[in-house]
């Protein structure tokens, strides 16, 4: 959230004196004009503060959802004079599509009844025998025979454990002449020259830090409870060595989003310690690039200047979905990347207005909810890109044409610096980009998939608070790229990283590095 301007100070006595002077001079119109101007300024301040308060409360209460119930929407629409047009042919209700996004289809959630435990988990059978007093038939006295078992399952947890791998290198000597010297088997390859750590241990450190958001000092304490004392610098060296080994893999991942049919881009800030900074730290940025929702690449920049995304994205040709960050404009002006707007960003400003009590924004939200309903319906029906594009043209375009007419009407009435005026202005300025999803059925309606890719970074940031250096931030970008792409391929992160690290330690040829990329690895292991 941007820093709010200071609260406006009003000299009430001065205002009264000024108005009194104008009235005494017979300048009633001028006095009324000044009153109107002052009230407009104060109203804008009030709306801004109400909006800021709503944002702070949502963050404090950790309410990240932007859903609005059908009942809320109906009540808000009753408070405004302008009503949206009748809905198009039947589509899912607002309740069914509230928060419907363009993510890949996930397994359908089951109800709240007892769920079957995953089949891949190991089973330990515990037999429970009928008590001796009940083993005989109460009617005839004969012993009852076993006819089967009534089975129920409970979930147990076995704490993760460390183990020591003892490498015994064969030593051979000649017993006959005793002059041929001793032959010793070569040592096993290691990621760290003098390291004591297997690929599984290194993978655990990486997954714990970057997937489970566990800082190194907490990992050190966990290992210490097992009697293994490790210096923080040792764990840091492990991360550094893993980064060096995995960097070629991350670079190959980086190429795929740029070549994808749909490129989605977003960024988030990260605090980086800097001894040369007066504050002791600087705000760097991690840029996320999502390619066809299969590839996730992250890059670090020390500032938010436009030159950094330009260096990353200037070679892009084709669709590029992002927010309205002005730093992307130079990329679009090259004429190769085509801007695709994000309806989640457009909706967010309007939702915040409703949250702050401005009922006018509910009209626009109603239009947008209906467009999302069309998307949800297309997903449920499993439409292919061509069919989805046709459905959008038939159902969504008329809704958006009506929404644009309403936005233009409101734009002429709302103060441009008010929260509602800014939300409406954003939609109008971005309108051409916001309509692009209508032209290609493979384009998502919003950029929330990329926002989700950044979520682990936001969660991790709350735990480790900062990167220790710019080098550490770049290491994080590398590991996030690999783990993020592995997550999109639905891979278990530790198993994948352990196998890849072991392959690299064993001398995997760089010319075959693509075989270790998450989609290729998933395919190879699914056929075993």
Predicted regions and their residues:
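Acidic/histidine-rich catalytic cores and adjacent linkers
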Residues: 317-318, 324-327, 366-528
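Conserved beta-strand -> loop -> alpha-helix junction used to position metal-binding or nucleic-acid-contacting
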Residues: 262, 324, 335-366
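Residues on one face of amphipathic alpha-helical coiled coils
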Residues: 41, 48-51, 55, 248, ...
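Short, amphipathic alpha-helical "recognition" segments used to contact nucleic acids or chromatin
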Residues: 199-212
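Short, flexible loop/hinge motifs at secondary-structure junctions
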Residues: 1-196, 264-265, 271, 527
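Short helix/loop capping segments that flank catalytic or ligand/cofactor-binding pockets
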Residues: 146-148, 182-185, 272-274, 297-299, ...
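Gly/Pro-rich turn-and-neighbor structural signature
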Residues: 134, 138, 217-315, 379-442, ...
């Amino acid at each position: 959230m941007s820093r709010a301007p200071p609260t406006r100070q009003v000299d009430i006595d001065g205002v009264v004196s000024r108005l009194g002077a104008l009235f005494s001079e017979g300048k009633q119109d001028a006095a009324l004009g000044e009153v109107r101007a002052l009230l407009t300024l104060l109203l804008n301040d009030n709306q801004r503060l109400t909006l800021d308060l709503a944002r702070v409360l949502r963050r404090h209460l950790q309410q990240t959802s932007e859903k609005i119930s059908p009942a809320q929407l109906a009540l808000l629409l009753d408070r405004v004079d302008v009503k949206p047009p009748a809905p198009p042919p039947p589509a899912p209700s607002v309740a069914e599509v509230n928060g419907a996004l363009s993510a890949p289809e996930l397994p359908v959630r089951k109800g709240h009844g007892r769920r079957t435990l995953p089949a891949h988990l190991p089973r330990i059978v515990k037999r429970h025998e009928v008590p001796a007093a009940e083993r005989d038939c109460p009617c005839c006295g004969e012993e009852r025979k076993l006819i089967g078992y009534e089975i129920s399952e409970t979930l147990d947890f076995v704490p993760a454990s460390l183990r020591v791998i003892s490498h015994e290198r064969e030593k051979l000597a000649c017993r006959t002449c005793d002059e041929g010297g001793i032959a010793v088997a070569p040592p096993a390859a290691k990621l760290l020259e003098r390291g004591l750590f297997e690929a599984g241990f290194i993978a655990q450190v990486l997954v714990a830090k970057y997937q489970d958001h566990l800082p190194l000092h907490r990992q050190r304490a966990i290992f210490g409870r097992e009697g293994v004392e490790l210096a923080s610098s040792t764990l840091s060296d492990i991360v550094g060595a893993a980064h060096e080994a995995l960097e070629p893999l991350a670079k190959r991942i980086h190429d795929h989003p740029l070549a994808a049919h749909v490129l989605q881009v977003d960024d988030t800030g990260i605090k980086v310690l800097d001894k040369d900074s007066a504050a002791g730290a600087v705000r760097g940025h991690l840029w996320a690039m999502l390619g066809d929702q299969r590839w996730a690449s992250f890059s670090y920049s020390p500032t938010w200047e436009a030159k950094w995304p330009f260096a990353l994205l200037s070679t892009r040709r084709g669709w590029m979905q992002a927010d309205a960050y002005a730093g992307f404009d130079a990329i679009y002006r090259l004429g190769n990347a085509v801007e695709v707007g994000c309806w989640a960003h457009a909706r967010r400003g309007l939702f915040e207005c409703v949250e702050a009590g401005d009922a006018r924004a509910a009209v626009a939200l109603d239009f947008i909810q209906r467009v999302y309903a069309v998307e949800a319906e297309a997903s449920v029906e499993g439409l292919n890109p061509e069919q989805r594009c046709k459905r959008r043209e038939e159902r969504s375009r008329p809704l958006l044409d009506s929404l644009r007419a309403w936005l233009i009407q409101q734009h002429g009435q709302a103060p441009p610096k008010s929260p509602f005026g800014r939300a409406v202005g954003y939609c109008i300025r971005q309108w051409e980009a916001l309509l692009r999803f209508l032209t290609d059925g493979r384009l998502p309606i919003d950029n929330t998939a990329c926002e989700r890719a950044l979520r682990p970074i936001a969660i991790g940031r709350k735990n480790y608070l900062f990167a220790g250096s710019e080098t550490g931030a770049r290491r994080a970008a590398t590991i996030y790229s690999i783990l993020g792409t592995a997550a999109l391929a639905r891979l278990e992160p530790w198993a994948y990283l352990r196998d890849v690290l072991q392959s690299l330690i064993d001398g995997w040829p760089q010319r075959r590095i693509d075989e270790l990329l998450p989609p290729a690895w998933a395919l190879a292991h699914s056929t075993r």
